[in-house]
Amino acid sequence: MPRLDVEKTIEELSLGEKVALTAGIDFWHTASVPRLNIPTLRMSDGPNGVRGTRFFNGVPAACFPCATALGATWDTELLHEIGQLMGEESIAKGSHIILGPTINTQRSPLGGRGFESFAEDGVLSGLLAGYISKGIQEKGVAATLKHFVCNDQEHQRMAVDSIVTQRALREIYLLPFQLAMRICRTACVMTAYNKVNGTHVSQNKEIITDILRKEWGWDGLVMSDWFGTYSTSDAINAGLDLEMPGKTRWRGTALAHAVSSNEVAEFVMDERVRNVLNLVNFVDGLNIPENAPEKALNRPQDQALLRRAAAESVVLMKNEEDILPLKKEKSILVIGPNSKVAAYCGGGSASLDAYYTVTPFEGVSAQSKGEVKFSQGVYSHKDLPLLGPLLKTADGKTGFSFKVYNEHPSESNRELIEQLHLVSSSGFLMDYVNPKIKSLTYYVDMEGLFTPEEDGVYDFGVTVVGTGQLFIDGELVVDNTKNQRQGSAFFGSATVEEKGSKELKAGQTYKVLFQFGTAPTSDLDTRGVVVFGPGGFRFGASRRVGQEELISNAVKLASEAEQVVVFAGLTSEWETEGYDRDHMDLPPGSDEMISRVLDVNPNAVVVIQSGTPVTMPWANKTKALLHAWFGGNECGNGIADVLYGDVNPSGKLPITFPVRLQDNPSYVNFRSERGRVLYGEDVYVGYRYYEKVDLAPLFPFGHGLSYTTFTRSDLTLTTTPEKPQYEESGEPITATVTVTNTGKVAGAEIVQLWVAPPATEVNRPVRELKGFTKVFLQPGEQKKVEIVVEKKLATSWFDEMREKWASEKGEYEVLVTGTGEGVLKSSFKVEKTRYWLGL
């Protein structure tokens, strides 16, 4: 279609058409006006891959490492490449808009979506978000910065009031958005669910209009988070352009009435529509047809990029006695619950059906030239493992039949609406549609055959947003239809997992029937949570095994093994949108397993997968420790590349790992209490707190070792002359450093530039990260690198009395760090205190 003449189109639109354009028509699409050639636009999650339009039975996609993993790369060029591939993935899914990146701030290790954001530091997070967005938009696809702002916990996320000082709001929580905008003016911004200082962000004029649009000069489209609109006139007047998803709750006839009664001025309505039409023009060059089919790419070059990203994200936490890299020629024992599980992404909006996955065991097995043995050690599932992949259909296919009916199972002569073949026994039905379904209330029979490999008692579990009963050979084993209890699955809208058990015989085939009723059939109290459409289901099973038996077997094998690697950590069950973790600990039994293995084999390598910090009570015992995050499709290969030395680890922690949860500055203020959460740590988030109170964490922000060694030398600073007021350039300061690879293997060094302020009018952090760069060096190679920072950004704090940034006069110390202990120091002066606003 030709580009729209926006102003002419606004004149030609009726009020009804304008109103329609300001709300989605379904979960993933905007409204169209065919008579004026205004097309519908498609959008898709999100943070670590482009899922497409279906949670349920969707088209597979590339899964990138989670955001904290990408944050650990500290690599803007890599993030730019990843953004470009995300753009291409979006086009393949027929999507004009990607709902990401996420750049909230991890004020606590417990945040359910902490893995979705890059870092606890605004400079690192903002620059990486800027470059990934730049890559996305270079492909013509619109990127969406989210969640604007202070959506830093899941507990009562739609109702909680985040009470935060203006200084902390500016210096910590808005800063990553501000810095990302300086690199890439994203086409879209998504508002947060929560309130900030008393007002929901989606109707907060100060945040949307005064700061984002006027102060920062941004002119894109502001959309709500899903069901995160809470008013008609207030939201429109504050600057919320688009309510998502459809069908609308707050616009439609209510908005038309508000305009006709001057609760919303017509020129304000036109502003909202103008931003929608400008977005249509922004993505016009994609030439994606309406209702485009969703396709898969999965090209060899994409797989190579995903593998490189997974390997670059791995952080070498410890490597005493050079235990790593391992020897491919030697035999190896692989232990642990994450060994044969592909923990490739977190849960919620970030989850997707990956093209393929590689488990750590598969990655190690592919590279080892010696014998590879396995021992489970412990299981770490929160809910019972999915039963679907263990089932067979009547004709021998893996999986089960999925039969949809309008009528309850008790009714005779039910009409079969649709039959599907599924493998996963976890389904979120919010985007499942069939024209024969009469309402949100319908029923599904899922049938398959289960043949156990071992005798024993088997536990079965059912979690639903709705109701569910599980039968084995006609016997009711699990009933989750009455007296339901609130759980955490499916964005916090599901029941807890109800369980039952049955003794089964190896080799005998049993008929499994799971009968599901959609969300309206539930008696669960869902106040305070979002129930997405028809709801969802999950059913699983596992043979009951004693933990001591598993650990003892692993310990015995470890005592005899030539090389041992233990894979433990979290999965999307433990870290997910919808709820926060209750603690920082690994799943039950994991710490005991690791500790006992280290007792008999001190050279065992420990690999932890999680998107956010975990406690490690055995950390002093281990000589070799890797942190591997949720690594995407190529997770297992990326880890194995580092374990065996094909890739020299270069990752640095983007978040602080405290010794214990109580050490974290948000410990006493991390949940909603009486409808609010107090950001009591103020600007002292993450490393800013630990350094201010001189409290040693387990592993600090920026930590990460290498298989080689580096030196940094010859620090010089080049400054520009001061002017009476800061101009747009911000008076650049260029730091030049010589970096030398003094070891025997090639590797990448991350050079970090920190600025320590002089004594000023207010308390400030000891030092703050202001810039960084990554450089690859062959053994013995030396390179000069430059880091450019703006004086106004490097020196300023937010003055609440003046409501401006303050760059106070004085001498500022520059500290340059990297791998190892060495610190280079220099300084520069600010001759005169200056105040400023803007981007």
Curated annotation (Swiss-Prot):
It catalyses: Hydrolysis of terminal, non-reducing beta-D-glucosyl residues with release of beta-D-glucose. Pathway: Glycan metabolism; cellulose degradation. One of its GO terms (molecular function) is beta-glucosidase activity. InterPro entries: Cellulose_deg_GH3 (IPR050288), Fn3-like (IPR026891), Glyco_hydro_3_AS (IPR019800), Glyco_hydro_3_C (IPR002772), Glyco_hydro_3_C_sf (IPR036881), Glyco_hydro_3_N (IPR001764), Glyco_hydro_3_N_sf (IPR036962), Glycoside_hydrolase_SF (IPR017853). GO terms for biological process: cellulose catabolic process. PROSITE patterns: GLYCOSYL_HYDROL_F3, PA14. The active site is at 225. Beta-glucosidases are one of a number of cellulolytic enzymes involved in the degradation of cellulosic biomass. Catalyzes the last step releasing glucose from the inhibitory cellobiose. Belongs to the glycosyl hydrolase 3 family. This is Probable beta-glucosidase I.
